[in-house]
Structures are given as C-alpha cells and as structure tokens.
Amino acid sequence: MSWQAYVDDHLLCDIEGQHLSAAAIVGHDGSVWAQSENFPELKPEEVAGMIKDFDEPGTLAPTGLFVGGTKYMVIQGEPGVVIRGKKGTGGITIKKTGMSLIIGIYDEPMTPGQCNMVVERLGDYLIEQGF
C-alpha cells in the first residue's frame, strides 16, 4: 500500500459521518511521505519543534504548536507519544512512530476524540509494522 493510500483510506476515512480536514504522514526529517490536497505546507522549524517536544515533552506548551504557520494551543497529550493542539473549534493530533509523524487536523463537527482515534489507530498500526 502506498503512503498516499494510508492518508486517503485511513486518515481521511468517514467516522460517524465526519472526517479530518487535512492529514499527512511526515518523516522525522520533515520530508512529506504523503498528504491530503489541502494540508498546509510544513516549515522545517515546525517539524523540528514537534520532534523536540516528543524528545523533551512540554517544550511547545509556552510557544504553541505551529503547522503551516497556524498556531495551535498545546493541550494534554501523551508525553513522547502524542501531541494534541486546539485552535478555535478545531484542532490537531500528532502521533509519533519510529520513522514518521502522523498528523490529523480537524474542525467541527468532528470531535477531538474522533481525530485522536483516527490518527492514533494508524500510528499504532505503523509502529507494529516497524515504521
């Protein structure tokens, strides 16, 4: 299965009539493996900030999480495993695997829990597969 198929079929899947606004799979080096058409362009320093927060949980909390220039307030995630952010009525979930970051962005009416489930389920699967 191609990386794009993971984005299209697993991250952008229909959950109770809702789906993510945008999604991507990105390497730890910032290279985009696959993304939805409307996923914002990541800046190298944004990916570096995510990786640093996974290595040193809490580093993004004071400044916020930036994705494509959009700032998200960091909310409780799982230190070293999942970063969660909130912006207005939407938000973001980022799951770290051994080689990649699984990123899902949502807006209402999708809920944070639905976003978390979609992103973390694929992340857990990729970890099991050695990615």
From Swiss-Prot:
Regulation of its function: Actin binding is enhanced by calcium Ca(2+).
Entry's Gene Ontology BP terms: nuclear migration; phospholipase C-inhibiting G protein-coupled receptor signaling pathway; regulation of actin cytoskeleton organization
Tissue specificity annotation: Expressed in vegetative tissues. Present in shoots, roots and coleoptiles. Also detected in endosperm and pollen.
Chain ranges for the short sequence motif Involved in PIP2 interaction as given in the UniProt record: 81-97
A Pfam family annotated for this UniProt entry: Profilin
Cystines in this chain: 13-115
The protein's name in its UniProt record: Profilin-5
